């Protein structure tokens, strides 16, 4: 482990201390390590061949012409990435889906971009977490 010194302006330090208090970190080093991991993962993982798991969250208008069929077809075309999906009816027209994905980061990002760009998908976000080992667990 390396010891480093950083300089932060007062406003940023106050915001960091607020995060530390809310999340219950024992010290600033733990918080900064977590924030650094998150920042590195967000900037590099989506374009890599690194294996990861992810949660794809999006809302869509199910009454848009052919959208449910297009989404279903996309999931069948990417069945190797999708592990499970939870579907929630938010109101008469709006649905929320949360899908757990597993695969290479670049493939997950490509799939999510495809889903999010469909007409009628209103909001989408992909959160990925790199996995430590390259072995896939199967239930065969």
Curated annotation (Swiss-Prot):
<dbReference type="GO" id="GO:0003677">
    <property type="term" value="F:DNA binding"/>
</dbReference>
<keyword id="KW-0479">Metal-binding</keyword>
<dbReference type="InterPro" id="IPR010985">
    <property type="entry name" value="Ribbon_hlx_hlx"/>
</dbReference>
<protein>
    <recommendedName>
        <fullName>Putative nickel-responsive regulator</fullName>
    </recommendedName>
</protein>
<dbReference type="InterPro" id="IPR014160">
    <property type="entry name" value="Nickel_NikR_proteobac"/>
</dbReference>
<dbReference type="InterPro" id="IPR022988">
    <property type="entry name" value="Ni_resp_reg_NikR"/>
</dbReference>
<dbReference type="GO" id="GO:0003700">
    <property type="term" value="F:DNA-binding transcription factor activity"/>
</dbReference>
<dbReference type="InterPro" id="IPR014864">
    <property type="entry name" value="TF_NikR_Ni-bd_C"/>
</dbReference>
<dbReference type="InterPro" id="IPR050192">
    <property type="entry name" value="CopG/NikR_regulator"/>
</dbReference>
<comment type="similarity">
    <text>Belongs to the transcriptional regulatory CopG/NikR family.</text>
</comment>
<dbReference type="Pfam" id="PF08753">
    <property type="entry name" value="NikR_C"/>
</dbReference>
<keyword id="KW-0804">Transcription</keyword>
<feature type="binding site">
    <location>
        <position position="89"/>
    </location>
    <ligand>
        <name>Ni(2+)</name>
    </ligand>
</feature>
<dbReference type="Pfam" id="PF01402">
    <property type="entry name" value="RHH_1"/>
</dbReference>
<dbReference type="InterPro" id="IPR045865">
    <property type="entry name" value="ACT-like_dom_sf"/>
</dbReference>
<feature type="binding site">
    <location>
        <position position="87"/>
    </location>
    <ligand>
        <name>Ni(2+)</name>
    </ligand>
</feature>
<dbReference type="GO" id="GO:0010045">
    <property type="term" value="P:response to nickel cation"/>
</dbReference>
<keyword id="KW-0805">Transcription regulation</keyword>
<dbReference type="InterPro" id="IPR027271">
    <property type="entry name" value="Acetolactate_synth/TF_NikR_C"/>
</dbReference>
<dbReference type="InterPro" id="IPR002145">
    <property type="entry name" value="CopG"/>
</dbReference>
<keyword id="KW-0533">Nickel</keyword>
<keyword id="KW-0238">DNA-binding</keyword>
<feature type="binding site">
    <location>
        <position position="76"/>
    </location>
    <ligand>
        <name>Ni(2+)</name>
    </ligand>
</feature>
<comment type="function">
    <text>Transcriptional regulator.</text>
</comment>
<dbReference type="GO" id="GO:0016151">
    <property type="term" value="F:nickel cation binding"/>
</dbReference>
<dbReference type="InterPro" id="IPR013321">
    <property type="entry name" value="Arc_rbn_hlx_hlx"/>
</dbReference>
<feature type="binding site">
    <location>
        <position position="95"/>
    </location>
    <ligand>
        <name>Ni(2+)</name>
    </ligand>
</feature>
């Amino acid at each position: 482990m390396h010891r480093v010194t950083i300089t932060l302006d007062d406003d940023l330090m106050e915001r960091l201390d607020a995060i530390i208090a809310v999340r219950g970190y024992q010290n600033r080093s733990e918080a900064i390590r977590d924030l650094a991991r998150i920042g590195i993962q967000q900037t590099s993982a989506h374009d890599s061949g690194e294996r990861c798991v992810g949660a794809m969250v999006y809302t869509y208008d199910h009454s848009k012409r052919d959208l449910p069929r297009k989404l279903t077809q996309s999931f069948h075309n990417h069945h190797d990435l999708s592990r499970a999906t939870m579907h929630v009816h938010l109101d008469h027209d709006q649905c929320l889906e949360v899908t757990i994905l597993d695969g290479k980061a670049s493939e997950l990002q490509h799939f999510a971009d495809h889903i999010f760009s469909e007409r009628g998908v209103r909001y989408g976000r992909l959160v990925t977490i790199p996995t430590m080992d390259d072995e896939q667990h199967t239930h065969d």
